[in-house]
């Protein structure tokens, strides 16, 4: 703990020593010593106070006043009832918060309260409803190194979900991809492994939570080590609460379509930069339950590789397709977030209204079960168990949806459940009526118009009279408290009524608290049934969302390809089409790829013609297919793809000292080192980040290599190197291009993909419409004409040498030389040959 305080005078240091020597500050320092990496929220009355370095950090982040206790100790504070807003801002800044509550005096007659830390809130352990971001998952990652493998867990404490997986150290791309999918709020590593993870490139700007090392166990049981780390962290952060995680799901290789980090980002599956709009998730999300929304996101990021799973989803959709969905959609809106409610129950953060949510959810589930069974839809919920739980809650819970947010702020149990409770409530109601009656009587008796009877938790009930009228108070008024502008009194009659009310309130609180706790325990007994119900509800919500998307966007059911070929007819980009302005239509395109004769498409066309969009729509159609959803196309026959790679666009990674070209080559290397025969690869402009011949040589070599494979991965290779179209003579390679139309001095991008190669790049036209100054555009056009006619290279000295070893230079034949080589002399007369020779002489003289 850093206790450094600036100050120069001897008096200051004397004041500081004295301030830190008080019983309260000694207590603070003792507690703070055990939680040095947290900001300690130290409860004092109705405030949480922060001291010393905690106060400096918190006041800066929260933008609240920093003051000094006894002129020496820096401090700041927040009201206890509004702590969630402040905690949320500290969590967003990556801080941990220790909540220290006060209970009772340390000993009889002592003014110092007993205080204990009851909860440590960290970015990855949030379960409090007000601190979570809507329905979204909030994951914590635990990483563990054992020999040549990295084991990792992704746990969402707010829902209880838990995922395990592992990857070789040599394949860190998988770990990085999983971190991109789960986006953990906090990453934990064992103390002894911290330096290893800090050295990894991906983690260089990441903060870690350091965990105590666990005892060694057999190598085959390393997932158990992850469980131990999680259990220990739960005990540390939740203290004595009963929080538990569910059985882990193993993310085994081959079960889901693998996508690396770059692919997830390039395709904008769930995020578009820092925005959430214009993504596959945003246009597809028609879900009405929190579980459905989380499940949809998981299925986008983890498309299936098992055809039987796809058939199962399609069968459910076929049943739902025959009915009117509106009643089901309306019913789903009444289902609460069961997973998070159960977690709150275990973590002692539940609310009275959570029981109403469970009751409404079960009621909805029972209705849905009846209707879906009639349709032969497999809605597999534990109906009988849920009915028993529903009856138990119904017997006790106060009717209506206006249950109190906090227990004690209104009726929680229904009238008639407890005779003792009913009597206490009646006494309380009567007592409050007596208070109103007494106030009216006293105003009339004393003729004091400022007289009011009020209540607070410290003073209790009191008669308040303004200072101006206080001297006129009757002699039977007993003074209770003096304030700046008023005097407070009591009377024997008021004290008697107060005792009646407070005794009634105590009885009400005692009964409701005891029954609340009992109801929590009872609900937790049915956790398994409720979670099973939640999964079924989420899946139903997902299937309905799929059907809504189909109807809204005109998508079709794809077929499963049995021969590995990919055939999309008039396919469209789902996100671009969904977000087009009214009146605009997306231009559809077709593509066929197999693993032999038409495996590798070299795609040419100008910038802005739509090459990247075309490639992305192929990838998104494939993902939708493997989610078990419909796809935007006229028809689609698609294979199961095991890995999807995209190399679309790259930028400098300056913080890591990496150029655009180096980033591009790293991404390309990852693809070439990890693809399989069943992969789908989308390359965009490989080699553009270096000199023309370097880049073209690399691109050429990649295409030659892929062509040489006996079974070729399905590949789209977009390029501006038109020379690469000559490779269509190689096995499996064919050409596609984006059609354009030249009209007067304009170029129309028709967005249509055709077989063949592009004639021009139209780069100068794109520069013109982008706003490049006219003199530069004109000069560029002149140079282009000159270069294309003479085929001469303008050599500009490069600022850095090439990254590759230059092969021995071989002069390419000139246009004239190529013309000579093409002459068929055996078919020409001597006169014709002499005439051609004369033409060549004239042409060469002009070029000198």
Curated annotation (Swiss-Prot):
Keywords in alphabetical order: ATP-binding, DNA damage, DNA repair, DNA-binding, Nucleotide-binding
An example Gene Ontology CC term for this record: cytosol
Domain of life of the source: Bacteria
Sample GO molecular function, one term: mismatched DNA binding
InterPro entries according to UniProt: DNA_mismatch_repair_MutS, DNA_mismatch_repair_MutS-lik_N, DNA_mismatch_repair_MutS/MSH, DNA_mismatch_repair_MutS_C, DNA_mismatch_repair_MutS_clamp, DNA_mismatch_repair_MutS_core, DNA_mismatch_repair_MutS_N, DNA_mismatch_repair_MutS_sf
UniProt record, GO biological process: mismatch repair
Positions contributing to ATP binding: 605-612
NCBIfam families registered for this protein in UniProt: mutS1 (TIGR01070), PRK05399.1 (NF003810)
HAMAP family referenced in this protein's UniProt entry, alphabetically: MutS
PANTHER family for this protein: DNA MISMATCH REPAIR PROTEIN MSH1, MITOCHONDRIAL, DNA MISMATCH REPAIR PROTEIN MUTS FAMILY MEMBER
Family assignment from sequence similarity: Belongs to the DNA mismatch repair MutS family.
Task performed by this protein: This protein is involved in the repair of mismatches in DNA. It is possible that it carries out the mismatch recognition step. This protein has a weak ATPase activity.
Listed name of the protein: DNA mismatch repair protein MutS
Annotated source species: Leptospira borgpetersenii serovar Hardjo-bovis (strain JB197)
Gene name tied to this protein: mutS
């Amino acid at each position: 703990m850093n206790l450094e305080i600036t100050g120069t005078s001897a008096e200051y240091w004397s004041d500081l020593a004295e301030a830190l020597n008080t019983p309260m500050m000694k207590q603070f320092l003792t507690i703070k010593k055990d939680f040095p990496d947290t900001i300690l929220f130290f409860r004092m009355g109705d405030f949480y106070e922060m001291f010393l370095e905690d106060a400096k950090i918190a006041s800066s982040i929260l933008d609240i006043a920093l003051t000094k206790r006894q002129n020496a100790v820096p401090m700041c504070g927040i009201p206890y009832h509004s702590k969630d807003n402040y905690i949320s801002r500290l969590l967003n800044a990556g801080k941990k918060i220790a909540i220290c509550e006060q209970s009772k005096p340390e000993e009889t007659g002592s003014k110092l309260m007993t205080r204990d830390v009851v909860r440590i809130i960290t970015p990855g352990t949030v379960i409090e409803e007000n601190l979570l971001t809507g329905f979204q998952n909030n994951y914590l990652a635990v990483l563990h190194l054992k020999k040549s493998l990295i084991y990792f867990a992704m746990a969402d404490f707010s829902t209880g979900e838990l995922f395990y997986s592992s990857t070789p150290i040599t394949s860190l791309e998988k770990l990085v991809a999983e971190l991109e999918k789960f986006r953990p709020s906090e990453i934990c590593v064992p103390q002894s492994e911290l330096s290893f993870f800090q050295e990894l490139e991906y983690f260089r700007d990441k903060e870690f939570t350091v965990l105590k090392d666990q005892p060694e166990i057999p190598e085959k049981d390393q997932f158990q080590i992850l469980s131990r780390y999680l259990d220990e962290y739960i005990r540390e952060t939740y203290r004595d609460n009963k929080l538990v995680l569910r059985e882990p799901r193993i993310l085994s290789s081959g079960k889901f379509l693998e996508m690396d980090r770059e692919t997830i980002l390039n395709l904008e599956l769930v995020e578009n930069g820092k925005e959430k709009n214009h993504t596959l998730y945003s246009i597809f999300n028609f879900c009405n339950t929190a579980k459905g929304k989380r499940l949809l996101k998981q299925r986008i990021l983890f498309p299936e590789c098992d055809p039987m799973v796809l058939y199962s989803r399609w069968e459910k959709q076929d049943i739902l397709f025959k009915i009117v969905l509106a009643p089901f959609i309306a019913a789903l809106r009444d289902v609460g977030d069961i997973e998070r409610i159960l977690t709150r129950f275990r973590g002692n953060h539940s609310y009275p209204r959570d029981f109403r949510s469970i009751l409404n959810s079960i009621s909805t589930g029972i209705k849905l079960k009846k209707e879906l069974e009639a349709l032969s839809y497999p809605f597999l919920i534990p109906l009988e168990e849920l009915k028993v739980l529903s009856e138990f809650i119904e017997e006790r819970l106060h009717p209506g949806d206006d249950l109190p947010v906090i227990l004690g702020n209104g009726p929680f149990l229904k009238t008639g459940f407890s005779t003792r409770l009913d009597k206490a409530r009646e006494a309380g109601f009567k007592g409050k009526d007596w208070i109103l009656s007494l106030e009216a009587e006293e105003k009339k008796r004393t003729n004091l118009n400022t007289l009011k009877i009020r209540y607070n938790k410290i003073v209790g009930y009191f008669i308040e009279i303004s200072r101006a009228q206080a001297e006129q108070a009757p002699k039977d008024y007993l003074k209770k408290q003096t304030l700046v502008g008023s005097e407070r009194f009591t009377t024997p009659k008021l004290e008697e009524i107060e005792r009646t009310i407070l005794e009634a309130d105590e009885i009400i609180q005692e009964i409701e608290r005891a029954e609340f706790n009992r109801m929590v325990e009872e609900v937790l007994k049915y956790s398994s049934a409720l979670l099973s119900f939640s999964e079924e509800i989420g899946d139903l919500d997902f299937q309905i969302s799929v059907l809504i998307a189909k109807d809204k966007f005109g998508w079709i059911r794809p077929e499963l390809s049995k021969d590995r070929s990919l055939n999309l007819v008039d396919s469209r980009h789902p996100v671009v089409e969904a977000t087009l302005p009214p009146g605009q239509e997306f231009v559809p395109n077709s593509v066929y790829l197999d693993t032999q004769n038409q495996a590798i498409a070299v795609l040419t066309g100008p910038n802005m013609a739509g090459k990247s969009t075309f490639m992305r729509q192929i990838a998104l159609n494939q993902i939708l297919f493997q989610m078990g959803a419909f796809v935007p196309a006229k028809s689609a026959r698609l294979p199961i793809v095991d890995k999807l790679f995209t190399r679309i666009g790259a930028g400098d990674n300056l913080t890591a000292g990496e150029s655009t070209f180096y980033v591009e080559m790293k991404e390309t290397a990852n693809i070439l080192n990890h693809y399989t025969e069943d992969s789908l690869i989308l390359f965009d402009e490989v080699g553009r980040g270096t000199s023309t011949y370097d880049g073209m040589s690399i691109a050429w070599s990649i295409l030659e290599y892929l062509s040489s494979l006996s079974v070729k991965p399905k590949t789209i290779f977009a390029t501006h190197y038109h020379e690469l179209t000559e490779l269509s003579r190689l096995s499996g390679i064919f050409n596609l291009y984006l059609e354009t139309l030249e009209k007067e001095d304009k170029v129309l991008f028709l967005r249509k993909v055709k077989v063949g190669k592009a004639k021009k790049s139209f780069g100068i036209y794109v520069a013109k419409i982008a706003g490049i100054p006219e003199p530069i555009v004109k000069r560029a056009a002149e140079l282009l004409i000159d270069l294309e006619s003479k085929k001469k290279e303008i050599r500009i000295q490069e600022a850095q040498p090439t990254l590759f070893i230059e092969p021995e230079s071989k002069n390419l034949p000139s246009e004239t030389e190529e013309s000579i080589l093409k002459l068929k002399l055996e078919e020409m007369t001597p006169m014709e040959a002499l005439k051609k020779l004369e033409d060549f002489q004239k042409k060469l003289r002009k070029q000198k």
